[in-house]
């Protein structure tokens, strides 16, 4: 089950990256929908050992199986990890590139636009190719592989 499903008032965010899917995120998402929840598929927080990881109102739960959903919704889950932003793995990080990880839908152009994703392209088109190349060269920006 990829994509968002509107069901109920409780909004559950679950990653839809390849690792989460391999760990059973679709089945967990379907269990939340069956329980009357709205599921939003988002990018991963990067805490892969907790996948499938669900987030409800900033609180994390994982790794989950479909049978864990009722305990999560009842507030009795032993798989509660507390506030995701306060988790030691996340709290010690300064996330620049991944600042919106776990909050946006990775394939959503609407989410991309909402967070200013087209601003760089608009600026590059405004100043033209030569000025864009000059700015990149001057900045020293390099590819992830060092190119």
For each predicted feature, which ranges?
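Feature of Fe-S/electron-transfer and energy-metabolism proteins
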Residues: 1-147
